[in-house]
Amino acid sequence: MHPLDNVIWQALTTRQAQFAEAYGDARRFDPAVTQLTAFLEPNPKGYASLAHLVGPGDTALLSLANRYEPQPGWELVLTFPGLQMVCEDGGNMADGLTGSHTRAFSPPSIVELGPPDSLEMVNLADLTKPGPFGPRTHELGTYLGIRCKGKLIAMAGERLKVPGYTEVSAVCTHPEHIGKGYARALMLEIMRSIRQRGEITFLHVRQTNARAVELYERLGFCTRKVVHFTVLRKCKD
């Protein structure tokens, strides 16, 4: 199996196993870290295992290879197609970010974010909706941000990690500052760090988010496959 196939499962059983809650053929991150959940296979055993991890009325966010098919005991809350994109050509960004994927740009100072910034990070994610982001998501990897007059206005960071690959995630900019190149600047810094570790950068994005997809393609990302992000709620007894 390729490391990016069933990538949430692979993260929770390899490089990020320390964050996993496990039962049978199911895994999920500690909900304070992220709502991402996975099973070995989307079969009755997988859903039965998942039912032991998710309480009645609670939700699970899955990334499925195929469209969700109704399962006993589960209510479909939301599903939408996404793209898994990979930047194999990361070499152009090493040592000063020279190459075809870069252009002159001088953003405000980029700062590393951590526990003291958690509330601001959650608030920015709640406003801009880049994907699930919890009070401990920053523990998954390096997160960088840009501030304006002391206020966090843009951020990006690392989320899923599997052998040889790290995901860039939570790429978002406050609506009042969109179009200034902040997301691009932050992504380049995260991608450079990943490349320096000898890893390949990947990401996930809504298939309908044309603005983001265009940015990622300019940075050298290519679509690897379509995935189906699916939110399920466990039915109450």
Where in the sequence are the language-model features?
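Conserved beta-strand-loop-alpha-helix junction that forms the acyl-donor binding cleft
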Residues: 62-67, 193, 202-213, 229-237
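Conserved catalytic-core motifs of GNAT/GCN5-like acyltransferases
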Residues: 77-87, 222-236
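A short, internal acetyl-CoA/4′-phosphopantetheine-binding micro-motif in the GNAT/acyltransferase core
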Residues: 37-38, 171-178
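Acyl-donor-binding surface of acyltransferase catalytic domains
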Residues: 1-22, 26-102
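Conserved active-site alpha-helix within GNAT-family acetyltransferase domains
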Residues: 69-74, 184, 207-225
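Short amphipathic alpha-helix that is part of the acyltransferase structural core
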Residues: 1-4, 92-131
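Conserved acetyl-CoA-binding loop-helix of GNAT-fold acetyltransferases
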Residues: 45-50, 179-194, 213-218
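A conserved beta-strand-loop-helix scaffold within acyl/acetyltransferase catalytic domains
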Residues: 132-172
